[in-house]
Amino acid sequence: MQKNIIDELTWRDAINQQTDADGLRELTEKKSISLYCGVDPTGDSMHIGHLIPFMMMKRFQLAGHHPYIVIGGGTGSIGDPSGRKSERQLQTMEMVQHNVEALSGQMKRLFGEDANVSMVNNYDWLSKISLLDFLRDYGKLFNINTMLAKDVVASRLDVGISFTEFTYQILQSVDFMHLYKAHDVQLQIGGADQWGNITSGIDMIHKIEGSETEVYGLTIPLMLKADGTKFGKTAGGAIWLDPEKTTPYEFYQFWLNQDDRDVVKYLKYFTFLDEAEINELAKTVETAPEKREAQRRLAEEVTRFVHGQAELEGAQKITEVLFSGDIKALDVKEAEQAFQKAPTVEITAEKKNIVDFLVDAGIESSKRQAREDVQNGAITINGDRLRETTLEIDPSENFEGKFVIVRRGKKKYFLARVK
C-alpha cells in the first residue's frame, strides 16, 4: 500500500515545520490537492539548494497532487529579505524577465512538459494591484508589531531594512491568496527561512475567507552537512543546475564525493528510491564504505533527474577515463567538460618538437626543464607518456585538432587550445 504523502515526507525527514500536521494528512488522504512553491528570479539558474523544495513538489506530483510553480517575476523585482543580512541590489526589469524565462525552462525539464504541473508568474497579478488597493485591501490586514516580530524582519532591525523589503511578506501572502481563490491552492511549501512569510499568508486568508478555511504551510529543514557547513557550497562556489555553469561531470562528481555521514540523508532527500532500497544502501556505508556504493547510486539518481540519461552516461565515462588515463577515448565535448577547470594555454596548429611545444605553450619555463621532464616520464600528451625529446607534437591528430591535453607530473593538467 502506498504511503500517504505526508508519511512519505516524514520518513524521509523532509519536514521541518507544518501548520497543522493532522489536518494536512487528512486533506491529502481524502482528495488530490493543489499546492505551490515559489522561486524568485535572482539569477538565471537554480542551484542544488533549490532542489530540496522542488523535490518535495515532485513527490506530491507523483502522488497525484497538482503543483503550481510560482516564478516570482513580481516579488523578484522587490527582493526577499529572508536569510539576508543586507539589502538586495534591485535588478532591472529586463534582467528579471531574462531570469524568469531561464528558470521556467529549468522547471519544465525537471517536471516534464506535459506533466500534472502548472507554471505561473506572480508578476501577472501583482502588477495589476494599485498602491491604494494594496494599502486598503491588504496592508490593513497586517499588524506592524506582528510583522516586526517575524524572524525575517527582526534579524534585520539592527542593520536596517527598507520599506520595500519590509512589505515582501505581504506580497507573498497576496500570492497565496490569489492562488487559493483562482486555483484552490491549499498548501504552500518553502525553505525553513520562509516560515514567517508562509504563516502570514495563511493568517491573511483566514481574515478574508474565514478562520475555517483549509490552507496549510510546510517548510523543509535547513540543510547542513555533517561538518556543520552549509550544504550546496564548495570551494569553487555554488553547484548550479545549468550545465553551462556546472557541467554534468562536475555535478556528478559533487554527489559522488559526499561524506559517508551525509549520503543516506541525501538519498532520502534527493532521490525517489524507496525505503527498502535506501536501507540496503545504508548497510553498505557501514559494511563496505570503501566501495562507495551509496555515493555512486546518489550521483546516478540526481544527475539523471537533473540532466538526463545521456549526460549521466557522459559523466560516468569521463570519470572512468580519468581513472584509467585513456584520455583519447573522450570526444571533444566530454574532454572539454573533463578539463574545464584546467589552466588553458594557447598553441599554434603546426607540428612542433615536444620541447619547443612545452616551452612555447608556457607549460615549461625552459628547454632544459622541458627536456628533463620528458626524459623522466613526467609529461603525457593526450594520455600518452612521452619520453623522447625528439618527438613531434601534431595538434591535428586528436580532438578534431581543437586542443591538446597535457599532463605534467601526476596531477597538473593543461588544456592547450589551438588559436
From Swiss-Prot:
Family statement drawn from the similarity comment of this UniProt entry: Belongs to the class-I aminoacyl-tRNA synthetase family. TyrS type 1 subfamily.
Family annotation (PANTHER family)? TYROSINE--TRNA LIGASE, MITOCHONDRIAL (PTHR11766:SF0), TYROSYL-TRNA SYNTHETASE (PTHR11766)
Which residues of this UniProt protein bind L-tyrosine? Answer: Y36, Y168, Q172
GO MF term list: ATP binding; RNA binding; tyrosine-tRNA ligase activity
Catalytic EC class: ligase
Name the catalysed reactions. Answer: tRNA(Tyr) + L-tyrosine + ATP = L-tyrosyl-tRNA(Tyr) + AMP + diphosphate + H(+)
> Which Pfam families does the record cross-reference, listed alphabetically?
SYY_C-terminal, tRNA-synt_1b
Position of sequence motif 'KMSKS' region: 230-234
GO:BP terms for this protein? tyrosyl-tRNA aminoacylation
What does it do? Catalyzes the attachment of tyrosine to tRNA(Tyr) in a two-step reaction: tyrosine is first activated by ATP to form Tyr-AMP and then transferred to the acceptor end of tRNA(Tyr).
Instruction: Describe its partners and assembly state.
Output: Homodimer.
Name of the featured protein = Tyrosine--tRNA ligase
Q: Which Gene3D superfamilies match?
A: HUPs, RNA-binding S4 domain, Tyrosyl-Transfer RNA Synthetase
Looking at the UniProt record for this protein, which Gene Ontology cellular component terms does it annotate, in alphabetical order? Answer: cytosol
List locations, semicolon-separated.
Cytoplasm
Domain S4 RNA-binding per the UniProt entry, residue ranges: 352-419
InterPro entries per the record? Answer: aa-tRNA-synth_I_CS (IPR001412), aa-tRNA-synth_Ic (IPR002305), Rossmann-like_a/b/a_fold (IPR014729), S4_RNA-bd_sf (IPR036986), SYY-like_C (IPR054608), Tyr-tRNA-ligase (IPR002307), Tyr-tRNA-ligase_bac-type (IPR024088), Tyr-tRNA-ligase_bac_1 (IPR024107)
Sorted alphabetically, which keywords does the UniProt record give? Aminoacyl-tRNA synthetase, ATP-binding, Cytoplasm, Ligase, Nucleotide-binding, Protein biosynthesis, RNA-binding
